[in-house]
Amino acid sequence: MGLQAYIEERKKDKDLLVMAHVVCGYPSFSDNMKELEIMAATGVDIVELQFPFSEPSADGPLFVKANEESLKSGTTVDQCFDFMKQVSERFSFKVLMMGYYNTAFRMGEELFVRRIKEAGGSGYILPDLPVEESSNLHAVSEQEGIEPIILMTPTSSDKRLAKLGEASRGMVYAVARKGVTGSKTNMSDDVIQLVKRCRQHTTVPIGVGFGISSKADMDFLRGS
């Protein structure tokens, strides 16, 4: 089942799905697996497995530290793909690769997408790859049935959102605020308005991220 169909099926029984995040190899892969066991037991629907990178430009200090510590411990891309395969075979939630374009560039876009597919992943999030430079990667992804997750931001014009919407597959990631991950987002009508703006330009499911950190945040978004 594709990512969009999976989300729509899950939403028949839940008015809000949960997407969680793990930095591969931090503090260790065994700890990651324990975290994922808890996530599965508490009903998480989608998990991003972040492949650590030395310059994680979209991430805040906590995530930067996690990336650095994982790399210092020797985490490799191959280990991350092996772990993704273990996770996708063990749990029923959908798994996404989250990382930076350098990973795809260094191994080649075709191999990158194929490795995600072979590891049981449903898609990927590469926040540093502009949609204008992603046509080949997206074409390869479509051939393999892997979804490129597009980011829509509050600073994007409607014209820009329309362009992003045309490229969206599986789901889009609405960035709740300007800045980097890991900091608190103050839930307000601005976030709801962003979701409404995104909805005008895409028919795929919308996930909201960056600083969603509490039940109160999720309750605020419920039904939006």
Segment roles from a protein language model:
Residues 43-45, 116-122, 142-149, 166-172, ...:
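Glycine-enriched alpha-helix->loop->beta-strand junction motifs that scaffold or abut catalytic
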Residues 20, 39, 47-50, 116, ...:
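Conserved, mostly hydrophobic/aromatic
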Residues 22-23, 28, 98-106, 130-131, ...:
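Glycine-rich beta-to-alpha transition loops that act as phosphate-gripper elements at the mouths
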Residues 146-182:
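Histidine/lysine/aspartate-rich catalytic loop segments that bind and position anionic ligands
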Residues 18-22, 47-49, 95-99, 124-126, ...:
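Hydrophobic faces of well-ordered beta-strands that scaffold small-molecule active sites
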Residues 29-41, 156-167, 208, 212-224:
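Catalytic cores of alpha/beta
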Residues 1-10, 53-63, 72-85, 104-110, ...:
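Active-site-adjacent beta->alpha loops and helix N-cap segments on the catalytic face
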Residues 5-27, 60-62, 66, 87-98:
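N-terminal small/glycine-rich loop or linker at the start of catalytic domains
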